[in-house]
């Protein structure tokens, strides 16, 4: 198992985007409808990681998944307030099927990301609809080790059935391919 670095993830997204490139991908009006996407994901992330959010959108959309990113939602208030919190809570609990924390070093210390994890935990975790996607700094350091002990996580692996790919690892030691998890 391997936690990807930001640079490795950028390279993966760049390969998946082809000639399209990585910039502006979140703000473009190219989304999957609920009827055509396998599932939809609320992507919890730090706003300091907009570059990685672009890459995550490419990564998941190449799997046929619709991604919700709060700052790309035109219905959100300009300044965060109670309406913002209520809209995010509704997106996590009612509208999106799954929850993914893009767990960069910025995200694991973000008050908003930790609040979103607290909202998603009781609604998504019992149904295996909650994962973290840890991304280490390019030096390989990652601050969220306690998350690995209690939450399922996405990692790259090449040692199990199906060969190299992305797997969801559960705290009890079991795993699914990312495709299996997305189809649950």
Question: Predicted regions: what is each one?
Answer:
Residues 1-33, 137-184:
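C-terminal interaction surface of TIR/SEFIR-family domains
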Residues 29-69:
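Short, contiguous, helix-prone interaction/anchoring segments in small proteins
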Residues 64-89:
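Conserved BB-loop
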Residues 73-75, 105-106, 132-141:
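Short beta-alpha junction loops
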Residues 95-96:
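An anion/phosphate-binding loop that grips the pyrophosphate of nucleotide cofactors and donors
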Residues 100-102:
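Hydrophobic beta-strand scaffold positions of dinucleotide-using enzymes
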Residues 105-123:
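Conserved TIR/SEFIR loop-to-helix hotspot centered on a Trp-containing motif
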Residues 124-130:
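A short helix->loop->beta-strand "cap" motif at the edges of active sites that frequently abuts
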């Amino acid at each position: 198992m391997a936690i990807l670095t930001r640079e490795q993830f950028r390279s993966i997204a760049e390969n998946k985007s082809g000639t399209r490139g990585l910039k502006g991908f979140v703000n473009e009006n190219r989304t999957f409808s609920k009827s055509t996407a396998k599932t939809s994901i609320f992507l919890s992330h730090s706003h300091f990681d907009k570059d990685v959010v672009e890459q995550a959108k490419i990564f998941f959309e190449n799997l046929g998944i619709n991604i919700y990113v709060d700052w790309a939602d035109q219905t959100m208030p300009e300044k965060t307030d109670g309406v913002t919190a209520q809209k995010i809570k509704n997106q996590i609990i009612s509208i999106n099927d799954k929850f993914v924390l893009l767990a960069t070093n910025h995200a694991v210390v973000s008050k908003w990301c930790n609040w979103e994890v607290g909202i998603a935990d009781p609604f998504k975790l019992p149904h295996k609809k909650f994962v973290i996607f840890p991304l280490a700094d390019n030096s390989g350091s990652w601050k969220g080790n306690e998350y690995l002990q209690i939450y399922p996580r996405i990692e790259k692996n090449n040692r199990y059935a199906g060969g190299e790919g992305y797997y969801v690892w559960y705290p009890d030691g079991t795993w699914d391919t990312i495709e299996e998890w997305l189809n649950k």
